[in-house]
Amino acid sequence: VPDPECPVCSTPEPDTDEAATITLKPAPKLRPGSFRVRDIGSYELPVEPYANPVCGSLGPSVVQDISSTSTSATIGCFSMRSGPYLRETFWGGHADTFAESVRIGVLEGLERYAGMRSRAKRAQVHASLDALRADGRAAVDPRVVGLYSDAFHRANPRVLPFTSDREIPWVRGWSLREGQTVLVPEVLTYYHAPGLENRFVQESSNGCASGGALEEAVYFGLMEVVERDAFLLSWYGQAALPEIDPRTSRRPATRQMVDRLEMYGYEARFFDTRISFPIPVVTGVAVRPDGGRGRMCFGAGAGLDPEAALAGALCEIATDAVNLQGRTERDEERLRAMAYDFDKVAALHDHPLAYGIPEMGDHADFLLGAPGEVRRPPRSFDELYGDGPGGRPALPASDDLREDLRRCVDAVTAAGFDVVVVDQTMPEQRALGLTTVSVLVPGLLPIDFGWSRQRALHMPRLRTALRAAGRRADDLPEAEIKAVPHPFP
């Protein structure tokens, strides 16, 4: 596989207004109920060129996780330098067969490879936000996306805070609301762009997605952004969420996996996490009823089909739950320290693993109820998503992803937000028929990992969204913000 950064075999593309322009085209779905335009088996994805010990762009190998008793998970890892820092990046797939999981994993690995830093094009605009505005150029304001607290910068003086007069690199994106090119700070879309001097936040792969068509990739990127925003609003805002009865699912695979988790000692619970938009978001929790080590893990899913959203959340918790007790016991001393000092929650994996400690599970009582507390009965899919009393119908799905995407974008922009798309596709992905994008919705809550990095805690939306959605009568006061690390994986 050619290295997209090789000076000999790379084929860089110019970052121009014309290249950033997006025109949504018809994207017929593969089949009814699907949100893909191609079957995953149709991509030419031999593993060896991507994962081999000599020149594997996605690392030396892909490993089958035979310890998993719920899904046939596969895992790969590659390392990449960002300045002097060497970062390990994991990728993988979670499906019913190893063959499918490998293909999903390679696609995810390529998506991560494309999104970590710009490989197909180079940032050609270096300017301050003030200078861009003086020139009349549209640009995403990092202050709207979210910034770290002053306390973070005092503790980490090498990470300089953003100021509107500071020159930084920008890449071109496309505003789906305004129908025009918009400049995006490079570090907000390429989350490991080299050069610490340009970094004022550490972004993640949130909003990055791949698909067999541009419309498919943008749809899934937007769903991810909406999902994480809703999860954080409900967690930090301690929102009471309606519980979904998974046994009312029309999908046999969903009901069977819920039963399988019960056999392994975990109850699978699911919650309707729609806050601001008529787009189904489901939070899943796998809970040990006995409250022991490996107490609980969380997952989430989003999409126009609530059954698919729940299945996405279920896949995450099914994969993690069966190994959680062992992972908790192996690292118990370090994880238990996090329960008493949240500043020790420093990295991505710390957030979900901390909730393997029994006492951390108490922080989820607002959602799950305290042990022994009488539960409200869960509601069926038809009750929650139908048009009957108490139901909140979701946006209708069509047979074309372009129409689904338009409906979702319209719902988000009607609430006052923009939807910005940056095309991250590498030439090597394009040759496979893939498109990779980064979707930003400035103003929605961003997902961060590390307790000191939680931008969501300082953003206006955390205080206003539940009131605007009719979930409470007033803005969320500071005293009611749940100042506890989120458990998102």
Question: What residue spans do the PLM features occupy?
Answer:
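Helix-biased "structured C-terminal domain" signature
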Residues: 2-489
